[in-house]
């Protein structure tokens, strides 16, 4: 690779990024092509990327694969990793685990952490090789030691749930914290939940709030919900119902069902906001229509009691049945009582027994 090739590549990158010049993908491609004529692996890779993404040219997976392979064959580990990925997906090339493994291993042997992660995934899933969590963990360990946050999270989560390894909360916390400190929201969320639940650590709502807040700021919906829940019902030092309502609205409006259920409860009880049964009904209906059993149960009770809606035993029974069919024990007990007393439905002791028995079964699990 000549100095001229490197200069051509750098000029191409300047045009690609708009660095010191007006951004121009056509100019970038021109200079990448000139560098590629001198077998510059990164320039060849960038040509592949431009065809892959349709940047400054028509998207062409086959043409992208051609350039990625050329770059990979010149030993560029980033290209080797991408070639492994396109063989997994069958994008521009015939799908094949054997070829994917070949290229992931080449990049992994150069300590390219993303390839080590992907190679570990192949072993974890048994794609093209016998399933082997020990080998997966070995490759992930190499990547994690290099600071790859995605792999650090994967290892932390494995130790947290005991998947492929014996549960080890100390190691889970170690790897999750390393990934969380690099800003990975999934790691921040799980670390926050360890502190919220006291899983392998001294329970600390303050610490939980800190990590959940970081993930929530990156729009991680489960973190927004759990932070809202913590502020809604956590210990005195973190409880802030009005802030909980603000947070829950953020995730509820984006379709997060558990947020919709909890937000409905805030409106129904008037906690952190003015009591508003219509808003409770609105959010519970959103979640119930999406199949959430808790919301279906809440709507059923609303209709039975006539709070926020006109009293309607048939509509109440319909929602309770939807929830009960999903194994919601409170809904099953409620149906059992309705059928045994004949309240809102014709008395039917067989149905009463069936629903109460179902509730007892689910509670015994």
Residue ranges and their predicted role:
Residues 34-35, 70-71, 106-107, 142-143, ...:
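Canonical positions in the second alpha-helix
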Residues 2-4, 8, 17-19, 24, ...:
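Short helix-capping/linker turns of helical repeat alpha-solenoids
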Residues 333-336, 346-365:
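Leucine-rich solenoid repeat scaffolds
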Residues 10-17, 46-53, 82-89, 118-125, ...:
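Hydrophobic face of amphipathic alpha-helices that form TPR/SEL1-like repeat modules
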Residues 22-31, 58-67, 94-103, 130-139, ...:
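Structural signature of tandem alpha-helical TPR/SEL1-like repeats
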């Amino acid at each position: 690779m000549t100095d001229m090739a490197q200069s051509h590549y750098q000029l191409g990158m300047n045009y690609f990024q708009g660095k010191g010049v007006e951004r121009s993908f056509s100019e970038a491609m021109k200079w990448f092509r000139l560098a590629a004529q001198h077998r510059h692996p990164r320039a060849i890779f960038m040509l592949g990327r431009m065809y892959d993404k349709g940047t400054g040219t028509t998207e062409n997976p086959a043409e992208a694969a051609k350039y990625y392979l050329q770059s990979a064959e010149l030993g560029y580990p980033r290209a080797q990793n991408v070639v492994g990925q396109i063989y997994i997906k069958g994008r521009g090339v015939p799908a094949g685990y054997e070829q994917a493994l070949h290229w992931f291993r080449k990049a992994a042997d150069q300590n390219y952490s993303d390839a080590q992660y992907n190679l570990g995934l192949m072993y974890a899933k048994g794609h093209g090789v016998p399933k082997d969590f020990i080998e997966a963990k070995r490759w992930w360990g190499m990547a994690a030691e290099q600071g790859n946050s995605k792999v650090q999270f994967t290892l932390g989560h494995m130790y947290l749930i005991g998947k492929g390894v014996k549960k080890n909360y100390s190691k889970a916390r170690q790897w999750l914290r390393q990934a969380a400190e690099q800003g990975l929201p999934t790691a921040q969320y799980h670390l926050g939940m360890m502190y919220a639940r006291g899983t392998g650590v001294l329970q600390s709502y303050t610490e939980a709030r800190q990590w959940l807040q970081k993930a929530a700021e990156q729009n991680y919906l489960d973190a927004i919900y759990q932070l809202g829940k913590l502020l809604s019902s956590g210990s005195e030092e973190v409880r802030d119902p009005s802030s909980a309502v603000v947070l829950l609205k953020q995730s509820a409006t984006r379709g997060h069902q558990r947020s919709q259920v909890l937000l409905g409860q805030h409106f129904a009880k008037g906690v952190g906001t003015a009591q508003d049964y219509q808003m409770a009904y609105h959010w519970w209906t959103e979640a119930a229509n999406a199949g959430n059993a808790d919301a279906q149960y809440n709507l059923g009770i609303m209709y039975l009691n006539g709070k926020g809606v006109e009293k309607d035993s048939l509509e109440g029974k319909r929602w309770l049945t939807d929830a009960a069919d999903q194994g919601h024990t409170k809904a099953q007990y409620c149906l059992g009582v309705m059928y045994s007393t004949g309240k809102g439905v014709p008395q039917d002791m067989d149905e009463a027994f069936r629903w109460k028995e179902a509730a007892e079964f689910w509670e015994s699990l």
